[in-house]
Amino acid sequence: MRMICIRCDKPLKSRVPSRQCQCKDPIKAEEHTEK
């Protein structure tokens, strides 16, 4: 699951662009994508 979030508290993969980062918490990812 690739979610676009501005800030990831706990990224699953360190080798990913700043725009595309995998957030462990989907809820937080949605909040980040919303802004």
Swiss-Prot record:
It comes from the Viruses. This is Uncharacterized gene 3.7 protein. It comes from Enterobacteria phage T3 (Bacteriophage T3). The lineage of its organism: Viruses, Duplodnaviria, Heunggongvirae, Uroviricota, Caudoviricetes. The gene is 3.7.
